Each structure stands twice: as C-alpha cells, then as structure tokens.
Amino acid sequence: MSNVCIMDHPLIQHKIGIMRMKTTSTKEFRDLVAEVAMLIYYEASRNLPLADKEVETPLTKAIVKEIEGKKLCVVPILRAGMHMADGILNLTPNAKVGHIGLYRNEETLEPVEYFCKLPSDAPDREIFVVDPMLATGGSAIAAITLLKRRGIEKIRFLCLIAAPEGLKKLQEAHPDVDVFIGALDERLNEQGYILPGLGDAGDRIYGTK
C-alpha cells in the first residue's frame, strides 16, 4: 500500500484554516493555494536522490549536493491544480510542467478527460501530480492511470484537502503512489463535496461560480 503523509506543520494548518473561511478573498485564497502547495512539496520532495558536485566558492573548492539528474515534472490537474504548480515552481523553477484536463460529470461524479500534454521525456522524470481536492478520488485515479499508460512510473500525488473515501479509493487503485495531504477531512456529502472542506477550489481560485 502507498505511503500517506498527512501534514501536521503549524504553518500548513494555519493557512488551510484561513482557506476554509468563506470570507477569504479570491486573491488571498489563490495566494494561499500556492503557499500551502509549496510547503507540502517541501515534504514530498524530501527523498529525491542527490549527487555530489564540485564547485568553487569565493575561497576554495567544495563538494556540494544537487538533485540527481534534476529531472522533475509537475503535473497539475486542470484547472484548480495550476496554482499549486505555481507554488511548487517557486522551489524548483527548472522543473518541467505537464497538464491533464479532467472535469467531473455532475450526474455520475466520474472524471472525463479533455486534455493531456506532457514533456516528451516524462517517463524519465519524477512526477508530482497536484490537485487541491481529493474528494471521490476519481480525478486523481484517472490522471495517474493516464500517466502510467504513457510509461510513467515515478509518481507522487499532492493535495490540500482529502476525504477518507477518496484516499481509500486512490490507495486501492494505485498502491504504489505516495500521497501527501495538507488535511484529511471528515467525509463527503451526497453531492461528492468534502466536509468541512473549503468549497469548490477552482471557483474560489478564479472567482467563478
């Protein structure tokens, strides 16, 4: 079964608390998505492989560490995942970015793919799939399945908020994918939304309804 890391860092919990508030403005919510994503990514990237490299300091030569190969790729699930990617790129600006477009059928709650664009060398890269909400698990499962069909094996999934139902389904479908979660909430409601959650992340990021 995959490893699941639920964040307990005070900064993450504080920022998610602000995001939950219905009075939080669109701009503040958008900024917080990027900030929390960056903090979660910090933990998710903890075990990236390192290699030695010799450099010259102003005084002498030194052996330093660098991420081996530097082959990272962030894959946001459109559209809400885009601002999570922005936060991650603040830490690793040279990472490549792929995009997967999925929307949820409001009757079946199942994801429907409408777009996929990935770097040509994606199978050689460490892939970080990002989506703010892990609700039913359908979008995350579909996105990861799509990546695996393209020969990609090194995949991690990052989200801000998860429901137990969605996490369970994701683990059952992809037990080899490690999952990093900002907060694990109580449950889903009848419409498939996370409770207490923070509303529709995409709408709150973009100021739409």
UniProtKB/Swiss-Prot annotation:
GO terms, biological process: UMP salvage; uracil salvage
Keyword Acyltransferase recorded: no
Annotated residues for binding of uracil: 194, 199-201
Superkingdom classification of source: Bacteria
GO MF, one example: magnesium ion binding
InterPro entries named among the record's database cross-references: PRibTrfase_dom, PRTase-like, Upp_B, UPRTase/APRTase, Ura_phspho_trans
Entry cofactors: Mg(2+)
Enzyme Commission code: 2.4.2.9
Involved pathway(s): Pyrimidine metabolism; UMP biosynthesis via salvage pathway; UMP from uracil: step 1/1
Residue positions binding 5-phospho-alpha-D-ribose 1-diphosphate: 79, 104, 131-139, 200
Database matches in Pfam families: UPRTase
Keywords: Allosteric enzyme, Glycosyltransferase, GTP-binding, Magnesium, Nucleotide-binding, Transferase
Activity modulation comment: Allosterically activated by GTP.
Cofactor note: Binds 1 Mg(2+) ion per subunit. The magnesium is bound as Mg-PRPP.
Catalytic activity annotation: UMP + diphosphate = 5-phospho-alpha-D-ribose 1-diphosphate + uracil
Enzyme class: transferase
Family note: Belongs to the UPRTase family.
NCBIfam families, per database record: PRK00129.1, upp
Function comment: Catalyzes the conversion of uracil and 5-phospho-alpha-D-ribose 1-diphosphate (PRPP) to UMP and diphosphate.
Record-given protein name: Uracil phosphoribosyltransferase
Classification lineage: Bacteria, Bacillati, Bacillota, Clostridia, Lachnospirales
